[in-house]
């Protein structure tokens, strides 16, 4: 074989190896978030665009699908179920739930969804691989409640819902009292990848709220003593927003590489400690505040009536709570716990666990009987 032919073969092999490496890097992120289950069991290493068997109920197929992404943690599974049930019972729209969880929780979740009134919902269970967070999150004992991996699922919406142009994300400690279609139809301004409810958009403009609570701003989440934060020229007094409920334009999200931007700031925080030492809320909030600074639309404040979990007392009137489109128990006092504001409103949407693994904790209950 001539030297020229050998050279050509070597170059051809080099090109093939380069293309294989490029293909592997392109798929690596998607492979970390694998769809979990159909009725037959774990899907395992199926690609992210694998479609599990949806549980069908009669819908108008001409209606646009409304993807709703929600996390399902084992110790908060009752919250996820109640949120899903409240959405399902209050709409006739074509909703598909993308439920993000771990493989170890999938069977428990599936048995709950297959019981009672939830049998007719359409859903897909997606496994969240914690390897996705390596090098992006550091353990902090003071933020233990916020460090749970599933709370970061909201950063990866285009991967969780790969074929959708738009999606809704919501936390598991919410109840929806309005038609989810209205939230989905929230108008987003050109160039905006998401719409949030701002912490200063006080719903008290519509009704007087007793004990309106703290108004948060950027300085409550970011360390303005750090040069990297100061260089961003973000006003410390800028009103923050709540990322527990938002509408995302996934086409714009992908165009702006929002996920990559969020991961960048997560890594920089691990290296430099950019978040406030007295963090006002979830650890997921600071990178979102940076990436979406003055670049987000707003949702109707009645679609995120929050702080119901900030204390056991009732900060809102019964009339206001009834009028709210979405109730959010963000804070330490969850409605499935021993004491929470308007727990009775939440409990109307709760479906008891058929396996008996999850139980509500109530003041009148003997703690020895709690599973």
From Swiss-Prot:
Gene3D superfamilies: Spore Coat Polysaccharide Biosynthesis Protein SpsA, Chain A (3.90.550.10). This is Glycosyltransferase 8 domain-containing protein 1. Its EC number is 2.4.1.-. It is found in: Membrane. Its main location: membrane. Residues 1-5 are cytoplasmic. Coiled coil: none annotated. CDD domains: GT8_like_1. The lineage of its organism: Eukaryota, Metazoa, Chordata, Craniata, Vertebrata. Residues 27-371 are lumenal. InterPro entries: Glyco_trans_8, Glycosyltrans_8_dom-fam, Nucleotide-diphossugar_trans. It comes from Rattus norvegicus (Rat). GO terms for molecular function: UDP-glycosyltransferase activity. The gene is Glt8d1.
